[in-house]
């Protein structure tokens, strides 16, 4: 697989719950085994659908996709549900030699990034256009993806996905003005998407799909 293409990394974690998308600042570079530099960007979000704490998710995308995502966010900043955007800097350094390929699909209805972290892990992240609850993906989490700066992060475990975990998606992100009807709709969407994701990739990995749970240390 091609490891030379430029890629960008978005991280979502769990601090901003209400009506907020945090589009991160470019703050460091990633260097892969071939010596190519890759820039990293960060986003933050809040309580995850898996409901385990403050874990993170990392999304890699190429230059074109990053620009499209930023443009989408910029074009929607004046919407009430995206009116509290802020930038967040994170002083983490990553080694990304395991990144093998990055690709993504974009249309007006969805952002669907696919990326390979190692030869054994291929993930597809679905983010619906209504980002006020679309960011509720932070517990999908990541496979092994290289070395982390452990002064910033701590690894809290490796979990194997089990189909019984699908039921944990039945909660709505805590948006104050989210009606009961909206919560039902949100939960239905998330349960459907998580079920598709987990069943698909767990099957490909012979029911051995694992994800690494990491948590940012308190400063």
Give the predicted meaning of each segment.
Residues 1-32, 36:
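Intrinsically disordered, compositionally biased low-complexity regions
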């Amino acid at each position: 697989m091609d490891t030379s293409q430029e890629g960008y990394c978005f991280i979502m974690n769990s601090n901003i719950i209400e009506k907020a998308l945090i589009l991160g600042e470019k703050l460091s570079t990633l260097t892969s085994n071939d010596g190519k530099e890759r820039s990293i960007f960060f986003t933050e979000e809040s309580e995850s659908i898996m409901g385990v704490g403050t874990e993170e998710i990392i999304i890699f995308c190429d230059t074109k996709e990053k620009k499209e995502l930023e443009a989408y966010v910029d074009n929607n900043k004046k919407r009430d549900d995206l009116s509290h955007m802020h930038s967040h800097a994170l002083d983490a350094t990553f080694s990304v030699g395991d990144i093998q390929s990055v690709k993504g699909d974009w249309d007006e209805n969805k952002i669907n990034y696919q990326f390979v972290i190692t030869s054994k892990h291929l993930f597809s992240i679905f983010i619906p256009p209504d980002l006020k609850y679309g960011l509720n993906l932070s517990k999908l989490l990541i496979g092994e993806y290289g070395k982390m700066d452990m002064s910033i992060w701590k690894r809290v475990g490796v979990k194997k996905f089990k189909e019984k975990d699908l039921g944990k998606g039945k909660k709505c992100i805590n948006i104050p003005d989210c009606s009961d009807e909206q919560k039902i709709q949100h939960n239905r969407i998330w349960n459907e998407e998580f079920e598709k994701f987990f069943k698909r990739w767990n099957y490909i990995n012979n029911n051995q799909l694992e994800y690494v749970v990491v948590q940012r240390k308190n400063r």
